[in-house]
Amino acid sequence: MSKLILSYRIGLGLVVGAAAGAVIYIVFRRNRKKTRKWTSKQNGYYSQKGDELDTSNNLQAIPGEADILTGSRGEQLDLLNRLDYVLSSIVELHQEVETLRSSLHGLAEDIVGEVRTHLEENQRTLRRRRFLPHRERTDSTGSSSIYFTATSGAAHTDAESEGGYSTAYAESDFERESSRASEAEEEDEVSCETIRTMRRDSVDLVTDDDDDEATTIATDPVDEELTLLLQKSDELHSGSTEQQREGFQLLLNNKLLYGDHQEFLWRLARSYSDMCTIAEDAQEKKSFASEGKEEAEAALQKGDQNAECHKWFAILCGQLSEHEGIQKRIQTGYLFKEHIEKAISLKPGDARCYYLLGRWCYEVSNLGWLERKTASALYENPPTATVHEALQNFLKAEDLTPGFSKAARVLIAKCYKDLGNNATAAHWLKLAADLPNVTQEDRESTTTIEEMLPATAEEELLV
């Protein structure tokens, strides 16, 4: 009996639970249909879904309430479309504002840049007027210029690659007064305008055979700021290894500003030559020599009447040939000789050019069998030179600038030794030993002196 009652209660509970679940499901479905949103969007406007249409049909049983819902939903649709239009307009307006803001920012940067440039130019002008040193008139030249002059005496203390050349700067009284007058007139007539005093640059100093000095000036307009930069470059080039590195970086940083000036370009080529000498890695040496040769070529394109351009082009050709094969070295040898001779014709007082030509002659006279055969196969007229020609060029360099280079005196001793004059060779070795080591060549020559002196003395005793 108890089992029957228990079964009856369980069955009744299941029926009641099923009925309650059905009621809850029907209520949930009805509420869900009533609260469904207008979410579908076609061509930028909102519309009903299929389920919502069914809901509106079900509501037709109550006419008044259905009309209210229909009108309310129509207004909501219109309101949603208007809100969508407003939002799209706001987005477009925001994009236009961003575009305008970026344009204004770029315009502001341009204006600030122009104002800063103008102020810097004015400040440079003021500094040039106030702080440029007063330069007295000299007898060497009558123009404002940078030039090189061969020195005598203790010239071995000069720059490594210049070999006895010092930088001078002079300004004539007439030019100084003319410059002051023109600046005063421009100050009265023009306000807030950059005033640059253009100068003439001279690079060639030609000495007359009758001891009457005649200066040949190669003119190139250079402003005072560039002139000061070139003077600083010359000073650093004449200094230590670190100063030469500093000078190279100084010129490299100003290449964009002054890369069109011949005087700047050949000095940059000279700095590349310095860096080639300083560098220890073979690939770095080749890279510096190659890039320096390109700068020297660019300088020559500005005009071929500048001795320094020809000289440094030849030097860099020689430095580059050290890292090339026999055929390329022979081809470069012709180019080297051509430009060194051109430099001598333009500037016959340059002892370094005679020294370089002497080295070329000495190396050609000592070419090996393979190199001679290669030159004969490549050229109808292969390069030729004698030890005597090399000696004459070395002696010319020593005559122009006594004590020009320890390496030059050692090469003079080698020439005399090759010609069989051991006594004179020993004399020049002793003279070379008296000079200090200035360049890397000088340091290498010290070892050569130590090796040659005893051998030369023994040969002299045997004779």
Curated annotation (Swiss-Prot):
A motif (FFAT) lies at residues 146-161. Residues 28-463 are cytoplasmic. SUPFAM superfamilies: TPR-like (SSF48452). It is found in: Mitochondrion outer membrane; Cytoplasm; Nucleus; Cytoplasm, Cytoskeleton, Spindle. The keyword Cell wall biogenesis/degradation does not apply. One of its GO terms (molecular function) is microtubule binding. Residues 279-302 form a coiled coil. InterPro entries: RMD1-3_a_helical_rpt (IPR049039), TPR-like_helical_dom_sf (IPR011990). The keyword Flavoprotein does not apply. Residues 153-192 are annotated as: Disordered. Residues 1-4 are mitochondrial intermembrane. Belongs to the RMDN family. This is Regulator of microtubule dynamics protein 3. The gene is rmdn3.
